[in-house]
């Protein structure tokens, strides 16, 4: 989780040195240029959303990322990955790349559909964007209020982060 350029937690990186590390400040000092640091799902969302209503982004890659936006504005710090999902395991454990490899794309896609149902109940989103490196492996057709996005949305989101 990143807040105001500071990495609060990064359990997926496996090193305590990231805990409360001012990444934006460190990069700015070393590069001599202003920097912005965002969660990857937040950044992808900035490049994907339309700015209408409550929009949510989930990213499927090494783990499970989430971002939430209201009328085009990021509502930061939504971190669902480490919450319990099913069978005592977290969203990351059940939906991450290791789980996909273990059970295959079809079984993993069913899990993702259950997670989407959870996110719908939790947020009552108007639109959901699904991205990340493994989104292309999903085996179901999305509902009309769900859009699959490619990783270029993250690059676009990086540019959008500077518009505020």
Language-model-detected regions and their locations in the chain:
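Glycine-rich phosphate-binding loop and adjoining helix at the ATP-binding site
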Residues: 1-54, 94, 143-164
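Gly/Thr-rich phosphate-binding beta-strand-loop-beta motif of the actin/hexokinase/Hsp70
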Residues: 53-77
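Solvent-exposed alpha-helices and their adjacent loops that cap or buttress functional pockets
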Residues: 48-52, 57-60, 120-123
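Glycine/Thr-rich phosphate-binding loops of Rossmann-like dinucleotide-binding domains
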Residues: 3-5, 66, 138
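Adenine-nucleotide phosphate-binding core of ATP-dependent small-molecule kinases
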Residues: 89-129, 133-164
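Fold-independent oxyanion-binding glycine-rich loops
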Residues: 39-41, 60-62, 132-133
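Short, well-ordered secondary-structure micro-motifs
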Residues: 48-49, 68-70, 78-79, 140-142, ...
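Glycine-rich phosphate-binding loop plus the immediately following alpha-helix
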Residues: 21-41, 74-114
């Amino acid at each position: 989780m990143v807040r105001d350029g500071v990495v609060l937690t990064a359990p997926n990186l496996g090193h305590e040195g990231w805990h409360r590390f001012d990444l934006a400040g460190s990069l700015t000092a070393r590069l001599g240029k202003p920097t912005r640091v965002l969660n990857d799902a937040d950044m992808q969302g900035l490049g994907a959303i339309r700015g209408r209503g409550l929009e949510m982004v989930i990213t499927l890659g090494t783990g499970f990322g989430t971002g939430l936006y209201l009328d085009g504005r990021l509502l930061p710090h939504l971190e669902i990955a480490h919450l319990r999902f099913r069978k005592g395991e977290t969203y990351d454990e059940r939906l991450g790349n290791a789980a996909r490899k273990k059970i295959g794309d079809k079984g993993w896609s069913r899990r993702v559909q259950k997670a989407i149902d959870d996110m719908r109940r939790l947020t009552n989103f108007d639109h959901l964007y699904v991205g990340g490196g493994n989104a292309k492996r999903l085996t179901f057709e999305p509902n009309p209020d769900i859009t699959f996005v490619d990783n270029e949305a993250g690059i676009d989101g990086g540019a959008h982060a500077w518009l505020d």
